[in-house]
Amino acid sequence: MRTPLNLVSQMSKTSIISFTPYQDINDVLTRLSQGMEVVLSKNLIGLYLFGSLSYGDFNQGSSDIDLVAIVREPLDAYELERIKQLHKRIGELNLKWHDRLECSYTPLAMFTEILPPVEPRPYYGGGVFYDEAPYGNEWIINNYLLYKHAIPLIGGDIKKIISPIDITEVQKACIRDLFHEWEPKMTDYEWLDNSHYQHRILQ
């Protein structure tokens, strides 16, 4: 029986797809994409890599692997449980990237929203899977980058799936993000002392 856990455990090196210049990251992305196709099947529209890996600003020591899975319908309980198991197994096989892979499972209908959607989405980040994670001001910023730079791991051209984002909406979101998220962190010394977050400030 073809299961996602069997796929990620038994995949040979010759079947790894070169999505990026980094072989270990390609291993993670290939295992995740192949497992996700089995779990989500027809509910999965596409899986896309965006962020620094997609536009040439990736730092192996501090950058995250940013992904979004676009789905037709919100994940049901069965899909959620199987996706959790998939992420757990991939994390066990690739400890280096266990805490630095981020993936949202976003219904297609949400992409019509300019402001952060009211409904949460399943999200994996920092080695933890959240059944319901709210979007913040990063929503439209990430969607702008997604539209401009996305690399399809599964699915077609992102520009045929979501609409372009007006840059003025991105600028508004950046201002909101500055005051709502970043300004309070300037007095959070524990957060500032974390080298991973220091890199984000420098960006």
What does each model-identified segment do?
Residues 4-21, 80, 85-200:
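Conserved NTP/Mg2+-binding pocket subregion across the NTase superfamily
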Residues 51, 56-85, 100-105:
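Catalytic metal-binding acidic patch
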Residues 2-48, 79-80:
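Helical scaffold of the NTase/Pol beta-like nucleotidyltransferase catalytic core
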